[in-house]
């Protein structure tokens, strides 16, 4: 516990700095991939390992963060993560080849993986129960706003400077965070460092199995669509490794006296339901964050910077609403807050499922704002419920597990909507093409209009007819793609409505005790 003379809000800002940069890094590199590939003489497919390598190492460290905090001491572990993340960010910007960049991104993911769980545990010990909701609202703002800023900021930096600066910008923030953490943060009395010489044993087999399973899962999710899923021997190999690692790892950890990841925490009903809810929250949040800018660019012709800006008002909405939810969470039944948030967000997604190719930028922004308003009512209440009955000494372990659930949900969600987008587009194209026949009077009218436009543009004869058919096919392709986007929005809305009943299985938290970290 920090010295009482230190303002706890200063500590909150200190530990939020590095977490904001880490979450930002999960999305900021996406738009820079073509520049990275060109500069480092790599193919487009090879350059995607810049993303995959970070996600794999990050996913492996997340559930281990609680165990590592106990082993090393939480402050020491957190500062080590900040130092590794900062140094590897500099090395990423300095990389002279794709291989070097991938290695440094793995290291960056290792450093970043422990930041969020450690920050949540630090905030939990820094603030009294009555103020934790507001404290974790600050953290929640950083976690939600950073992914929405990432694509826009990455594009702006790449266009105006160099792709290397998307990594260099982490360095001064990391150094500042490291210095402030050293001066301001300390471990609470109960959080004593466990030394190996005192008999603390490392379950190397469990550690290896969990790492193998999570790493393989992340590779499958990141590469599956590109390699046509299980038609690829590469994906089948990693599917086998994933099953061996996860099944073997869970069995091993359930039997271990000192588990690396304590899955026994899922015996607590509130923690188990909240972990499942966090999976779906990650699924819907990150999927929609990918879909909206992609739709605006691909179908409506907006530049990348404008498409990214469409998400910003949603981030501002969450920034405004999070403190209000932090105030309400100790006064209103969390089950009602969660139900309200799910209902609003699901309704917004179903409204999006009614969009068409005449959509303007304003209505796209309004849809995201409405969805974000609902999302703001989910993060804090879900986690208040999750940790209501978790012993304080288990907080570090629990934050790692629930963060992992959210990140896996995000990866599964993005992989799902990306696959559905391609396959539903093909399906809708086939259905629309069924209406293309010479006996269809509407088709004749449309072709005549296209032909007239071609002739007025200088084409004539067979060339004009061919151009008219090309214009018709482009129209069908755009319409089919739009329908596929709408199918995805509908799916996400149905998921959010579908999970509402499980929240009424939660036991209402007693606000007088328990630990309340928020993700």
Language-model segments: residues:
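Transmembrane core module of solute transporters
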Residues: 6-70, 78, 99-102, 162, ...
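Structural signature of transmembrane alpha-helices in multi-pass secondary transporters
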Residues: 22, 51-54, 58, 85, ...
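Small-residue-rich segments within alpha-helical transmembrane domains of MFS-like 12-TM solute carriers
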Residues: 23, 27, 93, 109-117, ...
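Hydrophobic transmembrane architecture of multi-pass small-molecule transporters
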Residues: 46, 407-498, 502-508, 514-519
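Helix-loop-helix hairpins in multi-pass membrane proteins, especially solute transporters
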Residues: 62-207, 232-233
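Small-residue-rich alpha-helical segments with characteristic i,i+4
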Residues: 146-151, 288, 364-449
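Symmetry-related core transmembrane helices of the 12-TM Major Facilitator Superfamily/SLC fold
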Residues: 167-182, 238-242, 487-504
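Helix-loop junctions on the cytosolic side of multi-pass membrane transporters
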Residues: 181-199, 251-260, 357, 427, ...
């Amino acid at each position: 516990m920090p010295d009482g003379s230190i303002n706890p809000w200063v500590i909150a800002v200190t530990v939020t700095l590095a977490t904001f940069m880490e979450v930002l890094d999960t999305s900021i590199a996406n738009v820079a991939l073509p520049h990275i590939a060109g500069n480092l003489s790599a193919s487009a497919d090879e350059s995607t390992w810049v993303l995959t390598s970070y996600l794999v190492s990050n996913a492996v460290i997340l559930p281990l963060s609680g165990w590592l905090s106990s082993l090393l001491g939480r402050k020491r572990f957190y500062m080590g993560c900040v130092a590794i993340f900062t140094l590897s960010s500099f090395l990423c910007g300095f990389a002279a080849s794709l291989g070097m960049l991938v290695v440094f991104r793995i290291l960056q993911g290792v450093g970043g993986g422990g930041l969020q769980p450690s920050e949540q545990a630090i905030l939990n010990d820094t603030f009294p129960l009555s103020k934790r909701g507001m404290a974790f609202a600050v953290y929640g703002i950083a976690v939600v706003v950073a992914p929405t800023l990432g694509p826009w900021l990455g594009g702006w930096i790449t266009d105006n400077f160099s792709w290397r600066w998307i990594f260099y910008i982490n360095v001064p923030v990391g150094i500042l965070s490291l210095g402030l953490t050293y001066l301001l943060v300390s471990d609470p009395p109960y959080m004593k460092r466990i030394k190996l010489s005192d008999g603390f044993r490392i379950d190397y087999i469990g550690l290896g199995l969990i790492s193998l399973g999570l790493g393989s899962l992340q590779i499958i999710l990141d590469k599956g669509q590109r390699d046509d899923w299980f038609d690829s021997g590469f994906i089948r190999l990693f599917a086998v490794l994933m099953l061996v690692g996860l099944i073997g790892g869970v069995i091993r950890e359930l039997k271990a006296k000192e588990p690396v990841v304590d899955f026994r925490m899922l015996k607590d009903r509130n923690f188990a339901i909240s972990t499942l809810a966090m999976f779906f929250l990650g699924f819907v949040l990150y999927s929609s964050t990918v879909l909206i800018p992609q739709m605006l660019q691909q179908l409506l012709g907006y530049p990348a910077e404008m498409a990214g800006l469409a998400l910003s008002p949603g981030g501002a909405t969450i920034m405004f609403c999070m403190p209000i939810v932090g105030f309400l969470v100790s006064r209103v039944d969390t089950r009602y807050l969660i139900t309200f948030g799910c209902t609003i967000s699901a309704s917004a997604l179903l409204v999006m499922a009614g969009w068409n190719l005449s959509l303007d930028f304003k209505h796209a922004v309004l849809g995201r704002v409405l969805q974000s308003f609902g999302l703001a009512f989910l993060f804090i209440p879900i986690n208040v419920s999750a940790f209501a009955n978790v012993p304080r000494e288990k907080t570090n372990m629990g934050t790692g597990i629930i963060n992992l659930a959210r990140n896996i949900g995000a990866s599964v969600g993005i992989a799902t909507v990306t696959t559905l987008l391609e396959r539903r587009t093909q399906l809708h194209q086939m259905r629309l093409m069924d209406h293309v026949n010479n006996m269809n009077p509407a088709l004749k009218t449309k072709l005549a209009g296209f032909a007239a436009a071609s002739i007025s543009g200088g084409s004539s004869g067979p060339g004009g007819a061919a151009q008219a058919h090309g214009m018709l096919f482009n129209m069908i392709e755009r319409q089919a793609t739009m329908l596929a986007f709408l199918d995805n929005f509908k799916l996400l809305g149905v998921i959010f409505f579908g999970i509402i009943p499980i929240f009424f299985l939660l036991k209402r938290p007693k606000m007088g005790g328990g630990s309340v970290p928020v993700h």
